[in-house]
């Protein structure tokens, strides 16, 4: 079942056409990678999907409903969550409080005083932390976390509204190889655990680390110059001569398959 259907998405900034009519679909239970050189249009696409900017032309349908014109908050409340290259967490709060704040937002109660929020759905927050292996550190300040654990916390926050679509913007940036594999293996496990449920999870992620892309993506989209130049299985994309030329300027193997496949 298609969770997300993007059709003929276009966007220009001044005289620069950042996106030139890209179209793709994302299915429930799928991990879809979006790759491309800097300036290919990946960030522009993500920013349109979660309502940060509006396309000049095209449609974005989520669960059969248009997302056009919705704010990031409205998009989030529809069931679209996003993690960022630079984690969006509150360093002075505990891990549990970070997740509780997301739960408040999911229940349309951000107006509540923080004194109330410290007790609001604490048990539920602990369970989201358990999903990412951080429940034992629930009362630790976020500032005390190692970087890889901050990314896990951000994942727990993103899951707080039980999304059907998770957008992950370079989730493993700045991580060591083992940390990258651990985070993506966790993400894949979360997706698979939700597959049998009515509210299954689909993931769209951008990534520069090709071992992550080829190790964890079910399908891959390749952008270059604002156009979708290739899509398919990791192996199909790896063997695509146009993709090889875009990345390496010649007809040679693109990348070796990564770990975690």
Positions of predicted regions on the chain:
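Glycine-rich phosphate-binding loops of nucleotide-dependent enzymes
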Residues: 2-261
